[in-house]
Amino acid sequence: MWGLVQDGSITKIINKPRGMVIGDVRYSRKIFELWSKAELEAKGIYEVVFDNSNKKDEQWYINTNQSFAFAGGKITASNGSATPKKHADTLWTSQDKTDGKIPDGKDVGDVAVEGLKTKLIRTVKQQAAGILQDTDWYITRKADAGTAVPSSITTHRAAVRTKAAEQETAITNAADTPALETLYTYVNTAEEGDPPVMERPLGELPRLES
């Protein structure tokens, strides 16, 4: 990506090589392949440098659009401050009702927009159900034929439910969006010099050993 600078201001952002007119002269797209950095800059064409220091994980934050600035002989593309996504549900209010914004079937206090916590807890429930589904046949067989469920399976299923409940509690108790992000962020918990062990505070749902 490049930018065209004229009289000290960026007048055009060039996303890919293309022909262009600068002043009264038309230049081929080939200049982006054949000309040196200095030759391009002599015509006011500068390669864009990306500053991602303000850009955050879009699972947790809403990033701003990039803005472009020319200073010190270079064009920099950067983001403004990211906004954390709402961790709690947004509810319909009395004012919403007065303004006629609440849809049919909903009322004051109902969820208008789900927050991250609701979505994450739903995912935990789905993941736990998916793991338990692998051993559901033991339960079906017991109901149909009276065959006892192995104790290892019973223990595993209980462990899945227990861990899922712990995860849901941790999510519920998170104070804000950065706290939720921390729960899901993997860090190396190994001692220095040992092979890396990547773990997250939220932990993992148990898997049945083969």
Describe the role of every protein-language-model region.
Residues 150-158, 181:
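Short, charged, amphipathic alpha-helical segments
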Residues 135-146, 167:
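Secondary-structure edge/capping motif, primarily at the C-terminal ends of alpha-helices
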Residues 1-133, 165-210:
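Interaction-interface detector
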